[in-house]
From Swiss-Prot:
The keyword Transport applies. This is V-type ATP synthase beta chain. InterPro entries: ATP-synt_VA_C, ATPase_a/bsu_AS, ATPase_F1/V1/A1_a/bsu_N, ATPase_F1/V1/A1_a/bsu_nucl-bd, P-loop_NTPase, V-ATPase_su_B/beta. Transmembrane segments: none annotated. HAMAP family: ATP_synth_B_arch. One of its GO terms (molecular function) is proton-transporting ATP synthase activity, rotational mechanism. Produces ATP from ADP in the presence of a proton gradient across the membrane. The V-type beta chain is a regulatory subunit. It comes from the Bacteria. Keywords: ATP synthesis, Hydrogen ion transport, Ion transport, Transport. Belongs to the ATPase alpha/beta chains family. GO terms for biological process: proton motive force-driven plasma membrane ATP synthesis. PANTHER family: V-TYPE PROTON ATPASE SUBUNIT B. CDD domains: ATP-synt_V_A-type_beta_C, ATP-synt_V_A-type_beta_N, V_A-ATPase_B.
C-alpha cells in the first residue's frame, strides 16, 4: 500500500478540512492529519469532487495552521481492532479506550461501515426477548432481530429505561450467550457516569461493550460512533455467534450533529434544517440490525429518540418510524403521575410481536391477553374522558368498572420498580388479575379455554367460566 501525503489544506470549518489538488481521493478513505506541532488526528474523506477533497477530522480542526498541516491518505477505510476481549471495555467513537486501559491489540480489524448484506440472505426476526418490563414484554414484545425504538422527550427517564433494558434483557431457554453493545451519543458526564456505574454495580459490565461520546466531544466523532458500535456488534453476532442487543441513545443528538456537519459542508437543508439525506443516513444505521440465514448470531436494536417539544411528527422520530418495526412511546402525563416507566400504551406498537409470542415462545394465551388488555384500556380511557365531563357518579356500573381498571392498569401493570425484573409469566398472570376487574361481557378477545384456565372470577375461584356466544367479538368502541 502506497500512502500519499499532502499539504494543500485551503480551509477549516466546523471540524471539516477542505483540501485542493488531491487526485484520486476516495470516499470513506482514512486519513491522518498532522499539525505543525507533530500531533496526529484521525480523519475520513466524506466528499470528493475532481481534485477537491473534504475531510472530517474527528478531533476537530481547532489550532490548525493550514500552511503547516500535513494530511496523509492511507488508502484504506476506517477500521477498528476487534476480539472477544472487547466485552467489558469502554471506547469512544473512533475505538480509542475511555476506561484507562490499554488500546485493543488484535490482528483482526473490521470496517466501521460494515459489509453489505444481500436482502435474500436475511432471516425473518423471531424469538422473544424478555426485558423484565411488563409494558414492553406483555404488550409490545421485543423479538430477536427487530429494530424497536423508544420515543421519549426532554426530562423523561429514557436513560434509566435504557439502562434497565441492558441490565435485564435475556433470551428464554437460550444457552447461547446474550451480550449488549451500548452506544451513548452526546451525553453529559453525569449521564455517562450513571451508565457506567449502573452496569458495574449490577454485574453486567462483563457482557457489555460501551461506546461513549460526551456532549463536549467534537460532533464529527458523534457521526462515527454508531457505526463503530455496530461494527463491533456485527463481529460479535456473525463471527462469534452471539446474540447481541444494541441500545443507542440518543439518536436525536446524532441527527443534530449530522445537521451541523451538513451545514458546514454547504448542503442544501430540508425539513427543519436537516439534510435531505437524513432518511438514508438513519436507514444505513438501523438496517444493520437483523438475522442472517445460516448464522447463529443476531443483532437486535433499541435506539432511543428524544422528540423535540414532544413532537412525534418531528423529522427524526418520523423518519425513524418509517425504518423501524414499531415504537415504545413515553408519556409526560404518566411521568408527572409518578409512574415509571411512563410507557404510553395506545401509540406504542411492536409490529413483529406476533412472531415471538404464544405457544412454545411465551405462553399460549399471550396474544389474546395482549389484545384484550389493549381493547380494555382503550375503552377505559374513553370512560375516563366521559367521567371528566359528566362526573364519575353519572357513569353506569360497568363503566365504573372500566374506570377503576384504568387506574389499576397504570399503577400495577405499567408502573414497576426500576430494579424490578418481571418474568413474562408474572406479567401475564398480572394481566389476568387486572382483567378480573372488568365485567364478564367485556372479555371478548380471549377464548373460553383461556377463561377457564387463567381467569380469576371474583367471589368464587372454583366457579366455572360462563359460556360466551362469540369469544373473538371485538368490544364496541362506544358503550
Amino acid at each position: 500500500m502506497k500512502e500519499k501525503e499532502y499539504r494543500t489544506a485551503s480551509a477549516a470549518r466546523g471540524g471539516l478540512l477542505f483540501m485542493r489538488d488531491i487526485p484520486g481521493g476516495a470516499f470513506g478513505e482514512r486519513v491522518i492529519v498532522k499539525d505543525h506541532r507533530g500531533r496526529r488526528r484521525n480523519g475520513q474523506v466524506i466528499f470528493t469532487s475532481g481534485e477537491v477533497v473534504l475531510v472530517q477530522v474527528f478531533e476537530g480542526t481547532d489550532d490548525l495552521d493550514l500552511e503547516r498541516t500535513w494530511v496523509r491518505f492511507l488508502e484504506e477505510p476506517f477500521e477498528i481492532p476487534l476480539s472477544p476481549d472487547v466485552l467489558g471495555r469502554i471506547f469512544d467513537g473512533v475505538g480509542a479506550p475511555r476506561d484507562d486501559r490499554p488500546p485493543m491489540i488484535a490482528p483482526l480489524k473490521r470496517n466501521v461501515n460494515g459489509a453489505p448484506v444481500n436482502p435474500v440472505a436475511r432471516a425473518y426476526p423471531q424469538e422473544f426477548i424478555q426485558t423484565g418490563i411488563a409494558a414492553i414484554d406483555g404488550l409490545n414484545s421485543l423479538v430477536r432481530g427487530q429494530k424497536l425504538p423508544i420515543f421519549s422527550g426532554s426530562g423523561l427517564p429514557h436513560n434509566r429505561l435504557a439502562a434497565q433494558i441492558v441490565r435485564q434483557a435475556k433470551l428464554l431457554g437460550e444457552e447461547t450467550r446474550f451480550v449488549m453493545v451500548f452506544a451513548a451519543m452526546g451525553v453529559t458526564y453525569s449521564d455517562a457516569r450513571f451508565f457506567q456505574e449502573e452496569f458495574e454495580n449490577s454485574g453486567v459490565l462483563g457482557k457489555v461493550v460501551m461506546y461513549l461520546n460526551l456532549a463536549d466531544d467534537p460532533p464529527i466523532k458523534r457521526l462515527l460512533l454508531p457505526r463503530t458500535a455496530l461494527a463491533c456488534a456485527e463481529y460479535l453476532a456473525f463471527e462469534q455467534d452471539l446474540h447481541v442487543l444494541v441500545v443507542m441513545t440518543d439518536m436525536t443528538h446524532y441527527a443534530e450533529a449530522l445537521r451541523e456537519v451538513a451545514t458546514a459542508k454547504g448542503d442544501v437543508p430540508s425539513r427543519k434544517g436537516y439534510p435531505g439525506y437524513l432518511y438514508s443516513d438513519l436507514a444505513e444505521i438501523y438496517e444493520r440490525a437483523g438475522r442472517i440465514k445460516n448464522r447463529r448470531g443476531s443483532i437486535t436494536m433499541v435506539p432511543v429518540v428524544s422528540m423535540p417539544s414532544d413532537d412525534i411528527t418531528h423529522p427524526i422520530p418520523d423518519l425513524t418510524g418509517y425504518i423501524t418495526e414499531g415504537q415504545i412511546v413515553l408519556s409526560r402525563e404518566l411521568h408527572h403521575q409518578g409512574i415509571y416507566p411512563p410507557v404510553n400504551i395506545p401509540p406504542s406498537l411492536s409490529r413483529l410481536m406476533k412472531d415471538g409470542i404464544g405457544k412454545n415462545s411465551t405462553r399460549e394465551d399471550h396474544p389474546r391477553v395482549a389484545s384484550q388488555l389493549y381493547a380494555a384500556y382503550a375503552k377505559a380511557l374513553e370512560v375516563r374522558n366521559l367521567a371528566s365531563i359528566i362526573g364519575a357518579e353519572e357513569l353506569s356500573p360497568s363503566d365504573r368498572q372500566f374506570l377503576d381498571f384504568a387506574g389499576q392498569f397504570e399503577q400495577r401493570f405499567v408502573k414497576q420498580g426500576e430494579e424490578e425484573d418481571r418474568s413474562i409469566i408474572e406479567t401475564l398472570d398480572l394481566a389476568w388479575d387486572l382483567l378480573s376487574l372488568l365485567p364478564q361481557f367485556a372479555l371478548t378477545r380471549v377464548t373460553e379455554a383461556d377463561l377457564a384456565k387463567y381467569h380469576k372470577w371474583e367471589g368464587d375461584s372454583e366457579r366455572e367460566a360462563p359460556k360466551m356466544d362469540s369469544p373473538h367479538e371485538e368490544i364496541s368502541e362506544k358503550s
